[in-house]
Amino acid sequence: VNGPGDRKTYFTCAFPSSCGKTSTAMIPGHTIVGDDIAYLKIKDDDVKAVNVENGAFGIIRDVNPDDDPVIYKTLTTPRELIFSNVLVKDGKPYWLGMGKELPEEGINFSGEWYKSKEDKNGNEIPPAHKNARYTIKISDLENCDENYDNKKGVPVRGMVFGGRDSDTSVPVAETLNWQHGVFMASSLESETTSATLDKQGERKHNPMANLDFLSVPISEYIDNYLEFGKKAKNQPSIFTVNYFLKDQNSGKYLNGMLDKKIWMLWMEKRVHGEVDAIKSPIGYLPYYEDLRQLFTRYLSIDYTELSYVEQFSIRIENYLAKFQRIKEAFSGIPNLPEEFETELNMQIKRLKDARKKY
C-alpha cells in the first residue's frame, strides 16, 4: 500500500475463493507482490514475506475494463497466458461479465456451443463457465511491485483476513491484539459462491481462509499462529474485512467496488499510528471523519455519516449467533490452545455486555 510520500507498507491477505483476494491485490494506485501464496518467516525482528509463485491464477468472470482495468488490459493484449472454460470464437477468448457483447456461437466447456444450447437435463448452457479462470505472470502486470521476486522478503506490517458475509461483519476492523486476531481469523466464515462446489449462499466455517489446505490438526495450526506472533518483536497488526455486507431490506451491497482501497489506506495509517480508532466489542473501528477524508481524497466520493452508520454498526445479535456457531464448530476438537477458548469466552462476554449497555 502506497502511503504518504514514498512510504510503502506491505500487507498479507487471506480470503476464501471469490471473496476479494485478487481484487484487493489489484487495488488501483498500489502494487502487488503476489496474489496467492506467501511464505512468512521472522527475520531481524520483523515478519518477512516472500512470493513463492511466478503467476496469478484467478476467476475471470466479471473481469471488465471498468472494475478491473489492469487485469483486463493484461488479458486482452498479446502475451503468454492461459484461459480455461471460456468461450473461444475465431481464436479469441470471451467470458461472462467482460463488459462486451459475446458471440452467439463458438467453442466452450460443452464443446461446439451456440446460443440457446441445452444440456441433457434441458438447462440452457451459458457461453462460458461461471468458474472460468485465467493464469498470467505477475511480472506482466503494470502494478507489479519491485520486490515481487526479492528473496530477502518484505516486512509485513499487517495481516488481513476476510470472507463473504452479507449480514454481520463490519467492512474493516483492527483486532484488539495478536491473540484476539488469531481467534478472529480462526472464526472466519464465508458464504459460498460459484467458485466452490457447494450450494451458493451457504455459510461455511473456514479458519484463516485455509481449511482445505491444512496439513496438521486445526488445534495445532491455531497454536502455531499464536506462537509465531509471540516470537516477532515487530508484531504485525491483524485486521478483518468484509466487502459483502448488504442492506437487509433491499439486498443491495453497502460497499462500492473500490471502497476496499479506503479500508486498506485506513489500515496503512493505523499501523503507522496516524489515526485513532474506536474500541468496540469486536475490535478497533475507524472514526467517521478519517474515512470521510480518505473517500474524498482518493475516490472523490462524499462519504456520508448515514453510510458509515449502516456499515459500522455492531450487529450484536448476529455476532452472538456467529460465535455460538464457532463454539459449536470447535466443540469436541482436542488440544485447543487455552488462549483460543479464553478469547472465545471474552468475545461473547463483550458482546453481551454491549447489548446490556446499549
Task: Give the residues covered by each predicted segment.
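Conserved NTP phosphate-binding and transfer environment spanning the P-loop NTPase/kinase superfamily
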Residues: 61-64, 71, 76-358
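Catalytic or ion-translocation cores adjacent to nucleophile or general acid/base/metal-coordination motifs
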Residues: 3, 7-90
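Short, basic, glycine/proline-bearing loop/turn elements
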Residues: 2-11, 125-133
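Generic structural hydrophobic/aromatic packing signal, biased to beta-strands
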Residues: 1, 13, 22, 49-50, ...
